A protein has these predicted regions:
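N-terminal helicase ATP-binding lobe
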Residues: 1-182
Length: 182
């Protein structure tokens, strides 16, 4: 399993590479699941993982169940705008602020050097309806025009501090076992 990408753009480039396009990228892969945890169908990077960059959408990576018939609740047919409720890209984790975060010590060690990590502990200043939470450490504008991909114009709203997530910090990710691990 590769490491996770730091940015949505890195994830997008990794997915292009999996399609045989784009330059080789050593920045990790947004595909961290091999099978849907709900139904067990295989997940393929070129087919079931999609990236929307800032310039063309919501700055999100979507992982869908690989069920070609669309019977799974997390397939592209049944959950076209969401997919599985997971985030695997650092930049998206800071903006979407999951309730449970599983990370290696290597990622946790970034805390003193990456100002965006303060968001993991609830230190936010606003929320963009399209891109998620904001902080002074993020390069982002307060508003975004309607996109050519169908997203409406949005303006950020002020938001106070949030409750921080529960953390599981593991030195070696492969040592995690049980329902969330191998």
């Amino acid at each position: 399993m590769k490491t996770t990408p730091n940015t949505i753009e890195d994830a997008h480039q990794s997915l292009l590479q999996s399609h045989g396009q784009g330059a080789p990228s050593g920045s990790g892969s947004p595909l961290q699941l091999t099978n849907c945890p709900w139904c067990g169908h295989e997940i393929k990077p070129g087919r079931d993982v999609k990236a929307e960059t800032f310039s063309n959408g919501r700055a999100r990576v979507f992982t869908f169940c690989g069920d070609a018939l669309g019977a799974c609740d997390f397939s592209a047919a049944k959950a076209p705008g969401e997919g599985l409720p997971i985030v695997t890209v650092d930049e998206e984790i800071y903006r979407r602020l999951p309730d449970l975060l599983i990370a290696t010590v290597d990622k946790f060690a970034q805390l003193p050097w990456n100002g965006k990590t303060q968001m993991l502990f609830g230190q936010v200043t606003g929320e963009c309806p399209r891109h998620g939470f904001r902080s002074p450490c993020m390069d982002d504008s307060d508003s975004h025009p309607a996109s050519r991909f169908g997203h409406p114009a949005v303006k950020s709203i002020a938001h106070g501090p949030l409750r921080p997530p529960d953390l599981i910090i593991q030195d070696e990710l492969h040592l995690i076992s049980g329902p969330l691990g191998n």
